[in-house]
């Protein structure tokens, strides 16, 4: 009995003694106790990478896009793209006019992954089966609503830029949404507009309105008079203190004045609606509404934005999503009969069954989830009678024309020029490009060596 009590006592003493030994020593007087830091001559935080003229501090695509590499490109005299005289430039590499370049740059028609830095300015090949065929359909088709399809890298964005150039020459007003992901990815400010009953994105709308203003001819915008009066709060820092509101009169002001309004963010949704309303009711000037990377919309029924219940916001509850689909479906109609709507899908986006069902290529599967199929989008596309135009691959004659231009631009390697017969080189590059894919053709020429 005594031995058992002693063992318990000793165990208790050992337990309490162990706790006292493990306890940290009190901090010296005048110092606060904290976590110990490892003494090291090297800081735990890596220093910022030093940016020098020769360093690669961006990824490859952004570096080549912004490094001004086109300044060292070989200047070549090329014919100018002109649809009215397209027979003279068929199957030839052409450049754009200065007016076209200015508009297309503002519209965002040229993308980073197109290797435009290899040449002084972006160029294109005028193709019989793509450029000429599509623009002829655009002019003659009774319902001018098209969706451009094709495999990745086949030239869908290039064809869309050629349509933009045609619109510039034919004096049309162009509205282009180059990256729908920018209003779907949840990275813009947004708020709910009680009057519109939609979620608006003020900063995105500000950039889009500026794009429309800068990309189009001021004389065209000025020629369209307003159909009614408007009043917006004034956010112009120059005179906002003495002029709290901007008033536009239908007898004095034009669409150019409407696009130039500087208003507060909460009113920007109403400003965008007013712009679309004015462009749709007028019949003087044709409107070309285009969307590149439209496959992002078709595969993103729910945006990355969330409402007050922490639920993802449906794409058609965003002002931009509804505005776009209203134009496509015909809910918003442009009064001018020459107006058109052109969509283009992208190979960088995932695919689902929405577009094939809308085009009648496959039947509806009632058991598929909304991740793979969005019935509302199918309904709107079919309501708008959207016609598919599939961009074909290059034929050998077009590959020959492109490689000849690349040779003149000093893009070809010396081993390709001197070590092979020209016919063998064409056959080889045609095969390496996947039987005529323009992007893969250029990759096989410029990215095939170390």
Curated annotation (Swiss-Prot):
Residues 21-40 are annotated as: Disordered. One of its GO terms (cellular component) is mitochondrial small ribosomal subunit. InterPro entries: P-loop_NTPase (IPR027417), Ribosomal_mS29 (IPR019368), Ribosomal_mS29_fun (IPR017082). One of its GO terms (molecular function) is ATP binding. Coiled coil: none annotated. The keyword GTP-binding applies. Keywords: ATP-binding, GTP-binding, Mitochondrion, Nucleotide-binding, Ribonucleoprotein, Ribosomal protein, Transit peptide. Its main location: mitochondrion. It is found in: Mitochondrion. ATP binds at residue 125. Residues 1-14 form a transit peptide. GO terms for biological process: mitochondrial translation. Component of the mitochondrial ribosome (mitoribosome), a dedicated translation machinery responsible for the synthesis of mitochondrial genome-encoded proteins, including at least some of the essential transmembrane subunits of the mitochondrial respiratory chain. The mitoribosomes are attached to the mitochondrial inner membrane and translation products are cotranslationally integrated into the membrane. mS29 binds GTP and is probably an active GTPase. GTP hydrolysis may be linked to subunit association. Component of the mitochondrial small ribosomal subunit (mt-SSU). Mature yeast 74S mitochondrial ribosomes consist of a small (37S) and a large (54S) subunit. The 37S small subunit contains a 15S ribosomal RNA (15S mt-rRNA) and 34 different proteins. The 54S large subunit contains a 21S rRNA (21S mt-rRNA) and 46 different proteins. Present with 1300 molecules/cell in log phase SD medium. Belongs to the mitochondrion-specific ribosomal protein mS29 family. This is Small ribosomal subunit protein mS29.
